[in-house]
Amino acid sequence: MIGVCVFNVETILNVYNAMQNKGPVTAKYITIAGEVKNPITLKAPLGITYAELIEMAGGTTVSDYALIAGGPMTGRICQPFDTVTKTSNAVLVLPRNHNMITRRTVKVTIDMKRAMAACCQCQMCTDLCPRHLL
């Protein structure tokens, strides 16, 4: 056992506000990034749609787009009219033909065949490495 607790800043802020104001969490800080005119992080009320958040970021810069809720590595594909929940943290707007979108929409049988190989030469690790090590 390590004996360490890890909290993100928003969680600590929510605990503080709950203790001081005795109120529930009614908003989340959300980052809207990718193919939008003005990538932003803003405080959004729970229940607002991703489409409304995209409009707050100036709209998309591509006509045919897909959304990923969460980060590029562990996020999931979502729809524009899905809503912000207490676990939301980011929305990535990407062209529908982007590698991160096509990778998440591939059939399970194809993905299983790729998993049998050590490397499928997709370059995903190289593209997403934050330190450009690969």
Model regions and ranges:
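Donor-nucleotide binding loops and adjacent catalytic segments primarily
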Residues: 53
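Short acidic beta-strand-loop surface patches of small beta-rich interaction domains
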Residues: 65-84
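Non-heme iron-sulfur electron-transfer modules
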Residues: 84-101, 133-134
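Active-site lining segments that contact anionic ligands and/or coordinate catalytic metals
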Residues: 27-29, 39, 64, 88, ...
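Ferredoxin-like iron-sulfur electron-transfer modules
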Residues: 101-123
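Short acidic, glycine/serine/threonine-rich loops at helix termini
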Residues: 42-44, 56, 78-82, 103-104
